[in-house]
């Protein structure tokens, strides 16, 4: 999965400003060859059941080649046969429009499911895969029209960044929804994971207390728990969650500040910066942009 991650963590400025980031993905499908009487055709296929076709389109990622694969899964092969039956039950002049309709429905449903499950949406790549699979249906299903052009697919990404004082901004205030639903989610495991990495920094002044095997096992456990915390946060709030981890690492209770300055030096802080910067990749998050301003 392609990731574009810009994560600038300037620890001295974490208490000053943060960036509220919003990404809006809009997919537009333009019909290049609209048929005459399209409204009548749409009305004719409106009541048709195309569930198997929609399920078939949503299955798998290696779209075009799997039609010729003799080892195609039995379930998917049955879905293809049932999809062909659904399309063949539609009037010949309406079959292409039915393919276009089921493609649009499958594309919309995939986006909705990914939003609910907090799975990063792959954008135009996955939409193109659905399109390729749908365009092969007329030939595979022996429809009256062997060629059915879905249309041009355009994916637009709109981003906005607004700098607001971090001290006035609790965890997750990149949007009203983040503020109301995500502020209660803890990030304590991520904080512990980062601090553990700081303690294991080559120049750390903390005493060595564990065997290497025990350290690695504990590190993997904390990293997994940290990733679980971040993945349980809504996608649009991932940036705020990571910034909250950094803020907590830097802003320990006042009574611990003196002790902390003796424990963590410049090398440890560089380790913390690197660990936090790698969190989106390690936890398979999709953070298009996450910037902490320096002034």
UniProtKB/Swiss-Prot annotation:
It comes from the Eukaryota. Pfam families: Tryp_alpha_amyl (PF00234). Residues 21-161 form a propeptide. Residues 195-208 have a biased composition (Polar residues). The keyword Transmembrane does not apply. The 38 kDa precursor may be cleaved into two polypeptides of approximately the same size. The mature protein is composed of a single polypeptide containing one or more intra-molecular disulfide linkages. Keywords: Disulfide bond, Seed storage protein, Signal, Storage protein. The keyword Transport does not apply. Residues 1-20 form the signal peptide. Belongs to the 2S seed storage albumins family. This is 2S seed storage protein. The lineage of its organism: Eukaryota, Viridiplantae, Streptophyta, Embryophyta, Tracheophyta. The gene is HAG5.
